[in-house]
Amino acid sequence: MKFDSLIIGGGVAGLSCAIRCAEAGMKTAVIAAGQSALHFSSGSIDFLSRLPNGQPVYHPMAAFNELQQQSPEHPYCKLGKRKVQEALDWYQEMIKARGIYLSSQEDEANHLRLTPMGTFRSTWLSQQTVHQFPLTNTAGELNHIALVTVDGFRDFQPKLAADNLSKLAQFKDVKITTAAVELPDFEEMQRNPCEFRSIDISRVLRDERKLHAFAKSMIQAVGKADLVVLPAVFGNGDGAATIKLLEGLTGFTICELPTMPPSLLGIRLEEAMKSHFKMLGGIILVGDEVQRGDIEDGELKRIFTRNHRDMPLIADNYLIATGSFFSRGMAAQRLSIDEPIFNLDTVAIPDRDQWYQPEFFASKAHPFLKMGVICNDQLQASANNQTIDNLFCAGALLAHYDPVFEGCGSGVAISTGFHVAEQMISKHTARQNQNNKERTIA
């Protein structure tokens, strides 16, 4: 099978690249081994929360010069400020077309999102159903917050969250209460409520009659509150509409927070991106895995997958965006770090004792998270120190940055995927123009 572009990996980086290529009319396919890390994600887009030295970032764009000084090999620095801004603007508009509205603070500063543990994480863009707490004066005008869960739901414990939230100095004058609301018609269900995950609850509450009953129970359980916080259990495609309806039924201001996996806020992004890609004519090879490829004369000629075996997949350009260790895009051996498909050149620390901090929850970053594939400024990979002209890298596979410590995972994934797509489009256009010119001469 022959394509203009083949994308290895179905996460944010891979799908961003694939969608942009498909928008340009390129024949594009995505090879996805399974569920992406979006199923474990908050559904917010982190741009840059901390600099490599640990300094918190208020305004990501304003921190670019300092980032360049501290980490010149950082993926953002390879792309440049303008390209990163262009990529994130494109992503906001693209995902908006699928009904998901991502926004930042009015001054485009970072904001805080509430976690299931009752702590805060800095991020840049959040979905319309997520309450944005400002970095300064975090509690704002809130006097009463109600943390509400579904009775028996294991993936959000509001009392634990309330205890942690009440310990924060900014919330010392804020009343924080908890409540549990029983699912409608619970006695008729055949399952124990402790077995229900967020997706199961979302299916129950799609029934409008049950949603009305749930709203009445919420009013009784909560009473009054300035902000009602619920776990994200309201559908992956229609969650925002359900929340809006629930606000109308209860009179509450309601926000969602991501649950323990599976995270519906993350799944919403994934399904929106996949449906958009398919609408553009893209192909997704689900449940398949690239096992090897043939590299000749500095080019990747073909790849072979588990399902297609001896039938190669061929493209003019390839992107590998298989993620880091969590997604098996990188493999850690006893004394080495490897990229397992093409054996690409990687950044590694020879002394294993230097891979990590002595404590897991350390104040400094774990060095192994900056290990990854070496790329040039065009994000082209290399093997045995030879650049592979038509093989690009994007996302968590890249070296020289720590998506967890720096809070920039989604931003790097989107911007590098977009940057690679723009180069693929440019090469594709040049090839078409050359072919047209040759036909004209002939």
From Swiss-Prot:
User: Could you give a single Gene Ontology term from the biological process aspect?
Assistant: glycerol catabolic process
As recorded in Swiss-Prot or TrEMBL, the protein's gene is named glpB
Q: What is the lineage of its organism?
A: Bacteria, Pseudomonadati, Pseudomonadota, Gammaproteobacteria, Vibrionales
Q: Does the keyword Flavoprotein apply?
A: yes
According to its UniProt record, in which pathway does this protein act? Polyol metabolism; glycerol degradation via glycerol kinase pathway; glycerone phosphate from sn-glycerol 3-phosphate (anaerobic route): step 1/1
Protein name as catalogued: Anaerobic glycerol-3-phosphate dehydrogenase subunit B
Q: Report the EC code(s) recorded for this entry.
A: 1.1.5.3
What's the family? Answer: Belongs to the anaerobic G-3-P dehydrogenase subunit B family.
What Gene3D superfamilies does the record tag this protein with? FAD/NAD(P)-binding domain
GO cellular component labels? glycerol-3-phosphate dehydrogenase (FAD) complex
Question: What role does it play?
Answer: Conversion of glycerol 3-phosphate to dihydroxyacetone. Uses fumarate or nitrate as electron acceptor.
Assembly, per entry: Composed of a catalytic GlpA/B dimer and of membrane bound GlpC.
Please name the SUPFAM superfamilies in this protein's record: FAD/NAD(P)-binding domain (SSF51905)
Which reactions does this protein catalyse? a quinone + sn-glycerol 3-phosphate = dihydroxyacetone phosphate + a quinol
NCBIfam families associated with the record: glycerol3P_GlpB, PRK05329.1-1, PRK05329.1-2, PRK05329.1-3
Highest taxon above the source species: Bacteria
User: Per its Swiss-Prot or TrEMBL entry, what cofactor is needed?
Assistant: FMN
Q: What InterPro entries has UniProt attached to this entry? A: FAD-dep_OxRdtase_2_FAD-bd (IPR003953), FAD/NAD-bd_sf (IPR036188), G3P_DH_GlpB_su (IPR009158)
What does the UniProt keyword field contain?
Flavoprotein, FMN, Oxidoreductase
**Example GO molecular function:** glycerol-3-phosphate dehydrogenase (quinone) activity
